[in-house]
């Protein structure tokens, strides 16, 4: 008896849609060969970030120096105003009288004592009576001396350290690029020149044949 073959029903609804995979050779090649390219792009982005940070640190340092300069200028102006006030008080208390004679002219100048501590121009303690003359001369000489400009110092020394570290990293990146540009020349320079005593195969064969003929004779 033959086996009854059951017919399989193939309905269009039961079939699964076919998946077709199409490979793009250009994209595949770009993905496989793009590792170095992406690495270079990451390096460029890091260098740009370092440059931006360096600019920000330099800007902060310039602003701090400008503020210090304005502060020093205000202190100088205040000191000049105090000196002008002192000079005005001294000239206000000065009286001069001239006496004319037939042979010469005599001028008598009278300067009254000033209380400089009361005007808050000099906050030093009052000296003894014996040393008053010497102390007054020293005070006048100190006022006449020109003031020297103070050296500029940054308030935050960490800013200068950050700037130096960032510039060092930039120089290191630039040195690496220069070294990688000419690697073959260094290898060529290490190669030894061919020796002049080296003989070729044809020269060796000729020598061997010449020796054999000489021995046969």
Swiss-Prot record:
One CC-aspect GO term: nucleolus
Subunit structure: Interacts with KIAA1191.
Tissue: Expressed in brain, lung, spleen, kidney and heart.
Main location: nucleus
Disordered as annotated region, ranges: 122-217
Coiled-coil boundaries: 34-98
MF (Gene Ontology): identical protein binding; rRNA binding
Annotated compartments: Nucleus, Nucleolus; Nucleus; Cytoplasm
Species in which this protein is naturally found: Mus musculus
UniProt xrefs under PANTHER family: NUCLEOLAR PROTEIN 12
Record keywords, A-Z: Coiled coil, Cytoplasm, Nucleus, RNA-binding, rRNA-binding
Regions of compositional bias (Basic residues) in chain numbering: 172-184, 201-217
Protein name: Nucleolar protein 12
Bias kind Acidic residues: ranges: 130-141
Family classification: Belongs to the RRP17 family.
Lineage: Eukaryota, Metazoa, Chordata, Craniata, Vertebrata
Function of the molecule: Multifunctional RNA binding protein that plays a role in RNA metabolism and DNA maintenance. Participates in the resolution of DNA stress and the maintenance of genome integrity by localizing to sites of DNA insults. Also plays a role in proper nucleolar organization by limiting nucleolar size and regulating nucleolar number. Mechanistically, regulates the nucleolar levels of fibrillarin and nucleolin, two key players in pre-rRNA processing and ribosome assembly.
């Amino acid at each position: 008896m033959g086996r009854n073959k059951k017919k399989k029903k193939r309905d269009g609804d039961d079939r699964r849609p076919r998946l077709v995979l199409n490979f793009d050779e250009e994209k595949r090649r770009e993905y496989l060969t793009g590792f170095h390219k992406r690495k270079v792009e990451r390096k460029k982005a890091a260098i740009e970030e370092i440059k931006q940070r360096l600019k920000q640190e330099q800007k902060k340092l310039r602003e701090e120096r400008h503020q210090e300069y304005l502060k020093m200028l205000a202190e100088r102006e205040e000191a000049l105003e105090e000196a002008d006030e002192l000079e005005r008080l001294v000239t206000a208390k000065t009286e001069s009288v001239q006496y004319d004679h037939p042979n010469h002219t005599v001028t008598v100048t009278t300067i009254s004592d000033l209380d400089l501590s009361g005007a808050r121009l000099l906050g030093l303690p009052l000296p003894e009576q014996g040393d008053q003359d010497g102390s007054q001369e020293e005070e006048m000489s100190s006022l006449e001396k020109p003031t020297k400009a103070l050296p500029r110092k940054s308030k935050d020394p960490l800013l200068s350290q950050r700037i130096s570290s960032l510039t060092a990293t930039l120089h290191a990146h630039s040195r690496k690029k220069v070294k990688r540009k000419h690697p073959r020349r260094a290898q060529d320079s290490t190669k030894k020149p061919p020796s002049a005593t080296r003989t070729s195969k044809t020269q060796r064969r000729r020598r061997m044949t010449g020796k054999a003929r000489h021995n046969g004779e």
